[in-house]
Swiss-Prot record:
Descriptive protein name: N-acetyltaurine hydrolase
Listed Pfam families: PTE
Organism whose genome encodes this protein: Dictyostelium discoideum (Social amoeba)
Main location: cytoplasm
Cofactor section: a divalent metal cation
Amino acids binding a divalent metal cation 2: E189, H221, H250
GO BP annotations listed: catabolic process
Residues annotated as binding a divalent metal cation 1: H26, H28, E189, D318
Lineage, top ranks: Eukaryota, Amoebozoa, Evosea, Eumycetozoa, Dictyostelia
Keywords assigned: Cytoplasm, Hydrolase, Metal-binding
Keyword Metal-binding: yes
GO molecular function, one term: N-acetyltaurine hydrolase activity
Length: 370
């Protein structure tokens, strides 16, 4: 165990922390999000049927709801999929090796070094496929341990005790994920609904206990309420978690009040703005607040830095659907590096601010401490 201390666990093995480089702390390379599919309705079908006009031969007015659900992303349905990304089955799976390599090669070409792949139990985690990507491109991939939302894990954990869940998380970190020898380098993303379910509370407590045994950070998927992060933080604190190594993800779709952001930051946890590039006027999964623009994200982070929380911030894209990949008309894994960092500099971010967000904070969080 002592050989792990001070190093970072990647999919290919332990690396020195200075090998990490520019890091996106919350991404998915392979994922199956079909549990969260919602069937389109008749009104949406009418909106998506593009008539070709008399004699054009291009009319798709006979399209059915099943067609709309199953058809591949194209120029014709691209906007509808962006607006209703949970209603197209093709969109809800990242499962194409060739495209994964192409997309992440672009990330590497733009200066990226490390992807934290936080797909966990219940949503199609695939360490062997991720290993192939890492080997092909020579980029670092850090895998996640633990359990996602109750909807995806109840079949696995309903009869498990907190201790059994804790032991399984530790096994994924110290021995290997599933039937592989590939070890996780972070706990999470740990799925939390709002309100929390009993299984999710067990998962949180198990994750806190596993952190004490592995020396890893915890990455949280909070429920969609501005009060959810503080409730989760309290449960983790009561269970012995090191809050300075707890990352509250999806902050940008969860808290839009600067005072609540500051209250959350005061706990010592890490605030993760991980939905850069997702700028939609309609957020299918709802919640108390909508989806902000990248400009809003940049402004909120800047305010947090000015309040002294520059070492408590990490960023990412959380790509988990095809429509956000460049191959399907989206922004891809390089959006932050190619578009956002220049905008941050124009906004007034210093080089130190940016290096902390992209390199130093991830390095500290991913370094194993026991």
């Amino acid at each position: 165990m002592t050989e792990r201390i001070g190093k970072i666990q990647t999919i290919k093995g332990l690396i020195e922390k200075d090998e990490l480089g520019i890091t996106h702390m919350h991404e998915h390379i392979f994922i199956n999000y079909l549990d969260y599919f919602e069937k389109p309705n008749e009104q949406e079908l009418k909106m998506c049927c593009l008539g070709g006009g008399s004699g054009s031969g291009n009319s798709n007015s006979n399209k059915t709801i099943e067609d709309l659900s199953n058809e591949k992303i194209s120029l014709i349905n691209n906007h509808w999929v962006q607006y209703n990304y949970n209603k197209n089955l093709h969109n809800l799976q990242l499962n194409e090796m060739e495209i994964a390599i192409r997309e992440l090669e672009m990330f590497k070409r733009n200066g990226g070094s490390t992807i934290v792949e936080v797909t966990t139990k219940g949503i199609g985690r695939d360490p062997l496929q991720c290993l192939k990507v890492s080997q092909e491109l020579n980029i670092n991939i850090v895998m996640g341990a633990g359990y996602y939302l109750d909807k995806s894990i109840s079949q696995f954990v309903q009869s498990m005790t907190e201790k059994q869940m804790e032991d399984e998380i530790v096994k994924q970190c110290l021995i290997g994920i599933d039937d592989t020898s590939i070890k996780a380098g972070i706990i999470g993303e740990v799925g939390c609904s709002f309100p929390l379910t009993n299984n999710e509370k067990k998962s949180l407590i198990a994750s806190a206990k596993a952190q004490q045994r592995t020396g890893l950070s915890i990455s949280i998927h909070p429920g969609r309420s501005q009060t959810a992060p503080l409730e989760i933080i309290q449960i983790l604190k009561d269970s012995g978690a090191d809050l300075s190594r707890v990352i509250i993800g999806h902050i940008d779709r969860t808290i839009h009040d600067i005072n609540i952001l500051l209250e959350t930051a005061k706990t010592g946890c890490i605030l993760e703005f991980d939905l850069f590039g997702m700028e939609i006027s309609h957020y299918p999964f709802g919640g108390e607040v909508g989806m902000p623009s990248d400009n809003q994200r940049i402004e909120w982070i800047y305010q947090l830095i000015k309040h002294g929380y520059g070492e408590n911030i990490v960023i990412s894209h959380d790509i988990y659907t095809k429509h956000r990949l460049v191959s399907y008309g989206g922004h891809g894994y390089s959006h932050i590096l190619f578009n956002i960092i220049p905008r941050m500099k124009k906004f007034g971010y210093s080089d130190t601010d940016i290096n902390n967000i992209l390199i130093n904070n991830p390095k500290r969080l991913l370094t194993i401490i026991k």
